[in-house]
Amino acid sequence: MAVNKEDIKKLREAQSVAEFPVQGLRTNQDGAIKANSITNVSLILQRDPLLAGKIAFNEFTYEIELLQDLPELMLEKGPIDDDYPPALLGYIESKYGVMFADRLLQGALVNTARKNVFNPVLDYFEDCYANWDGKIRADDFLPDFLGVERSAVTALQTRLFFTGAVAKAYKPEMKFDYVLDLVGGQGAGKTTLLKKVSNGWYTDQFTDFENKDNYANMLRALIINDDEMTATNNSSFEVLKKFISSEVMEYRKPYGRSTVRRAKSFVMARTTNEVTYLKDKTGERRFMPNMVNKSLQKYSPVTDLTQDYVDQLWGEFTAYYRDKNFSFQLDEEQEELLNQNRQSFMYIDAEEEAIEVALQTWNDDFITSSDIGDRIGAGDLVNNRRVAKKIKYVMDNRKDWAPSHRKFGKATRRGYRRLQ
């Protein structure tokens, strides 16, 4: 019986491939594994006994990660950085006798990871919610650990901010423009508290809000902290407002070929030891100040803020997020509560203080800018545009006076009317 050479060739190729622990690999005519096949690299990453199920895409950080330590390759779990591909390529070459190009491995890592997606933050929140004991801790969190006043506004601000963090994890595209400010109390552990409660998803490594090199780092965090307000002080107020209210961040990764657009999936906190730090009256509604008092602390964030306590907090905040009655849309009473709290942290310069005195001692319910100018000794405002602009700026942002006009004979004068 004649032997078909083609049948023998196919048999040898099948025997060669069968020797490998991963089946289905594409081979050359001589039975060797094809080195120019991204499919082969992907199959090895997905089916090799050592590598299978270990490579995944982190949906929160947008990074490819190794889910477990690989001591055989001296690789640790976590984001796959530039040190990992050489180890993986070396392992594949030694086991399969084929050396793949780095670009093929990079593509295969993406293909493999995208088939194994996870979100560690959502997994964490779900676990915290499932194990929450039902006890309310939010209202006492800042008073107990930072000595903040135990009040309705503290409770409101705490619930808003941390429930906002949960919401941004579940729905990054959601608009959330509140900022938690921890003020004063030097040495009380403000930064430590934020780090611990962030459960590892934290960064304070940025110095402004315009350098897009910072964005990738921010997007790996749940809470970003402008520590000592370094970035705030390095930015104009307009830039700060734009950053806080933005919903999408656009940047280019190092060595990236295209621009990346990501929904802003974090919330922002700030720390400062300067008490009267709110200097702009036009956009301060975004900020929620909390006065820290070290002498009133019951517990230390450094030694007493345990993982179990943090887990219970997030379980509670996740419960608020799930509660259909919870809303980030504040009613008038809540808005006024936040506004009154902010007044204690407003910076007032000498001219603003003089304007305040002028208004408090004015007996009529109507006043003009010229009246105010006379009272504070500014003289004719026609020749003093700087003070005229300052008066307008102050009056336009007061809640107890509103723009109005009054007739004096046949003439009408513009000014402000006191609200009852």
Please provide the spans of the model-predicted regions:
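Residue-level preference for alpha-helix termini and adjacent loops
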Residues: 50, 54-72, 144-145, 168, ...
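Generic detector of short, locally flexible boundary/turn motifs and exposed helical patches
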Residues: 88-91, 144-148, 186-194, 230-237, ...
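P-loop NTPase catalytic core of nucleic-acid-dependent motor ATPases
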Residues: 112-220, 370
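N-terminal nucleic-acid engagement/recognition segments and initiation subdomains in replication
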Residues: 1-134, 153-156, 382-389, 419-420
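Feature primarily recognizes SF3-like P-loop helicase cores of small DNA viruses
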Residues: 97-119, 175, 205-206, 211-236, ...
